[in-house]
């Protein structure tokens, strides 16, 4: 059952859900598939259970999901697409799960506002990746389709340092 699946995954403490009168705010740190894709199978199971959870919430009221989803969804979301095809966070399987999430009734807020903009939210500490802007867009605000028209702005603040990630912002009029 879905409850069992959530209990199976809950011990890692990756999801925090806040209920507001008009919407749910879900913060998530998606499992990384790791070097050698050691956790890819677990990740696929987790993605299905998490999507089912979001759909349960969405049946009650709109959902705003934010967090490190550990996937660069499209080639525009990663600097070196060709050389990262089998890297954790850019496998066909992980990207397909993001496609499934969006197809289930959700909108990538940054892409909705900036369909062609190349901007990243994460850079490896290795190889001076941030200096070279060799990054990945793996941090998102995803919203229920029925509130997507209320998005006023969606930004990535890559001018902010202090982490291998930078802040992402959503301005939505609910």
Which role fits each region the language model picked out?
Residues 6, 31-47, 82-86:
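Surface-exposed cleft-lining segments at the edges of enzyme active sites
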Residues 46-134, 138:
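Metal-dependent phosphoesterases centered on the DNase I-like endonuclease/exonuclease/phosphatase
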Residues 6-8, 130-133, 158-161:
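Short Gly/Pro-enriched turn/cap motifs at secondary-structure boundaries
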Residues 13-29:
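Beta-strand-turn-beta hairpins that frame and shape the catalytic cleft
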Residues 25, 147-150:
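Short helix-loop capping/hinge motifs at secondary-structure junctions, enriched
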Residues 155-174:
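Surface polyanion/phosphate-binding segment centered on an Asp-His-Pro turn
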Residues 12-17, 137-139, 165-169:
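Short hydrophobic/aromatic beta-strand or adjacent loop that forms the aromatic wall/cage
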Residues 1-4:
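Short, small-residue-biased leader/transition segments that mark boundaries at the very start
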């Amino acid at each position: 059952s879905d409850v069992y699946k959530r209990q199976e995954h809950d011990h890692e403490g990756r999801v925090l859900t806040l209920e507001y009168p008009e919407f749910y705010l879900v913060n998530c740190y998606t499992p990384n598939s790791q070097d050698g894709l050691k956790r890819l199978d677990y990740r696929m199971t987790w993605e299905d259970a998490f999507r089912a959870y979001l759909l349960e919430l969405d049946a009650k009221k709109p959902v705003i999901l934010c967090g490190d989803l550990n996937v660069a969804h499209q080639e525009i979301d990663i600097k070196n697409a060709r050389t990262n095809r089998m890297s954790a966070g850019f496998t066909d399987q992980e990207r397909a799960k993001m496609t499934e999430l969006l197809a289930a009734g959700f909108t990538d807020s940054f892409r909705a506002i900036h369909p062609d903009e190349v901007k990243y939210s994460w850079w490896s500490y290795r190889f001076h990746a941030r200096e070279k802007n060799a990054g990945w867009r793996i941090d998102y605000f995803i919203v229920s389709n029925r509130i997507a028209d209320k998005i006023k702005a969606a930004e990535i603040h890559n001018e902010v340092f202090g982490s291998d990630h930078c802040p992402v912002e959503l301005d939505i009029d609910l």
